[in-house]
């Protein structure tokens, strides 16, 4: 990709810089493209020109779910991106129709579609976004370039200082700098060097580790559902989960996870055993006898971390933080991608309303970005803090009361379509959390499920046949 030109000094040329060439960075660049003449993406590594692993993204080997709330946001920013994913082999799975899920209170029924999820490898997801974003001539990528520091003052960020792959140091100026560099972001340090106070920081660590392996899917499973067995945080045992995500090229990506004291290991001969050891063995049964296409990959960097940038007084002009640089979540919940997309939409919307150089734009964007972050954060840490050995701020009385209501809501969702719809609206980041406390939903929750709980996974006869004899097409 060609190198951007920062030599132009005319007063009318609007420039933006995005730190990080991952998904958050490309979405931020897409959000900026109608509001800046030149958008430079500063990326430390070389980006693949095809669906391939990206250096610095070890979590890409594990299951990633793009919930409908995030997919819609990405489609807003990059029209046609959903069709491109599907053409490349991704699956659009209806929810809850295409989901076989045991949550803490039991099996969910496969009601007609109210939401959806995009299922594919992270490599494919990222590549399509990168391909569509960089097709815009206003977006240029400066790869193999290290960001050294921010330029400017505590009142305004005016650009960045970088070191290129040949060792040259350069200053790039911009009207707006967006940090989308992910969980390794050094934004608090960069801002501190300019005299900006450090943001409040919070962590919740359940000690979760996760292990993944790719299998060749059985013949005839092109429309197989997403399968998931979740843990029950109310039990005083480590939380263990298993998930099968059907991905492109006739493969199943299987991810196991366990909190402190119950983590999966990296031994291939223990993978299926772990999958059978959770609350229901369906995932272990489904992968029995399948051809493994990869080794087991284990990741342990799963701490929930949040920087409250929106609370910093006198936030500098010209600087915004998005995506995992703001907050990272236990990946079991699959919210990181969707939150990044909704944060980029918040950036785009504020640019439309106020313009690139409007006073206090950055502070307004940072507050808007915090809204989807807060929802995903509460969903993640409210669950994780309950596990044995979890480290972090314990919930107060109000939070414990809310937890009891949510437990009752999850029980009701096992046999009540309207409650299931409200649950998926919130879980997919498609609706506000207030959807769970509307009068009709509260009344339904108080009454409880209208149907008896399922006693087995809600697989169809054909799917059951595949589960019992995975090498044969029923």
How would you label these PLM feature ranges?
Residues 135-274:
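Predominantly flavin-linked oxidoreductase catalytic cores and closely associated redox partners
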Residues 119, 262-376:
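FAD/FMN-dependent oxidoreductases across multiple families
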Residues 103-122, 159, 256-261:
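Helix-loop-beta segment of a Rossmann-like dinucleotide-binding subdomain
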Residues 65-66, 112-131, 186, 233, ...:
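Short beta-strand to alpha-helix junction loop
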Residues 8-46:
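N-terminal Rossmann-like FAD-binding beta1-loop-alpha1 element of flavoenzymes
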Residues 348-474:
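C-terminal helical "tail/cap" subdomain of flavin- and related membrane-associated enzymes
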